[in-house]
Amino acid sequence: MALEPSSKRGVYEGKRYTDELKNEGQKLSKRHRGRFDPMNEAPYELSRGRVENYLKCKACFWLEQIHKVKPPEIPSFTLNTTTDILLKRDADAVRGRSTLPLWEKAGLGHMIPWQHDHLENWANSLHYGLNDTYFNTVHDETNIKFGGGIDDVFLNTKTNQLHIVDYKSQAQGTRSPIKYEVKPSSLNDPWKIGYKRQMDMYIWVARRKGFNVSGTGYFVYVDAQHKN
């Protein structure tokens, strides 16, 4: 294998790469995000988290979106991030081909990780509003671009419908090591209403993108055991 010497072709390739970066920069500059600008005609980007902020505290939402006054941020837990990475890695190993033991055990052997060219973009929560290949939709009536980053999508091989999947981490075990019990996972806790709204929004976005999406989403809980 030989290295190609520097040539006019190399200069051309470098220029083309520079032009691509320039074009990408122009696209980014046209995006309407962060502080709301009434003079900007581009769709205003609102993530699922921002919508949740509006529902919890309209004054806080107004301060952040109009005056860029952000509330104190809670650092993310490394355990949660690691859980997502490992579960997605397992799904990628059989994506588009077969199910996973966890799903088989739950009686959902007909569910397989969905394969799609844009799935990696759909998982990108930082750049969800970049273009149509990312997980977003424009609500024409308000000129708002709603979106976010999803964890995964599974295909129901019986119905040919898609199901949005969200990965969660928790520790439901009791504190006492003597009489240790693990509480059953539930979505009925008051603070988990945001999980349900998140799922509803992601199903809505996916349907507006033209996909046959089921109204049933799945939450995959990883429960940390601290018995010993």
Regions inferred by a protein language model and the residue ranges of each:
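Metal-dependent nuclease catalytic cores that hydrolyze phosphodiester bonds in DNA/RNA
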Residues: 2-161
